[in-house]
Amino acid sequence: MIGSKLKEAIRSYSDFPKKGILFHDISPIFCKPDLYQELIEEMAKSEILNSSDAIISIDARGFLFGSCISLKLSKPLILARKAGKLPGPILSSTYNLEYGENSLSIQKESLNEFKNFAIIDDVLATGGTINCVKSLLTSHNKNISGACVVIELLALKAREKLDFPIYSTLTL
């Protein structure tokens, strides 16, 4: 049921942000508070999230889901930010996107109290972003219970590159 509602709300744009990319815009979800709330409720049911000690949410659209879900589940929220956005000692890693390269950072001290993490993001495309967070966590002997995303782009086969459970509310 939620999948069909999301499919109706999401808009797709060809050749954005680069020629050859089909961009799925989730912005219309936020103009429909009932749908946004239903999506948060649905994602929060995931065993992946419920079995974690903390949630890591990915800059920037992942924050829109991670913050709501962490409050709903009373789980700590850790932000994976783009390079240059976090003060203090950080862990950083670079990854490839469908359309370029990017880096993510996590404040080192934010990981100290926790062992098992769930990752939240808006879209699972190539798996590069989520794998970047995984490498940051595993380099510090942390576990990943899995990842939760709003949309999974099946044609890009990211799931094959990830060695942990994935929960997606909509597959395209």
Swiss-Prot record:
* EC code: 2.4.2.7
Please name the pathway.
Answer: Purine metabolism; AMP biosynthesis via salvage pathway; AMP from adenine: step 1/1
Principal subcellular localisation of the protein: cytoplasm
Q: Identify the HAMAP family for this entry.
A: Aden_phosphoribosyltr
Protein's gene: apt
Q: Which CDD domains match?
A: PRTases_typeI
Stated name of the protein: Adenine phosphoribosyltransferase
Location within or outside the cell: Cytoplasm
Organism phylogeny: Bacteria, Bacillati, Cyanobacteriota, Cyanophyceae, Synechococcales
Q: Which organism is it from?
A: Prochlorococcus marinus (strain SARG / CCMP1375 / SS120)
Q: Which residues form the signal peptide?
A: none
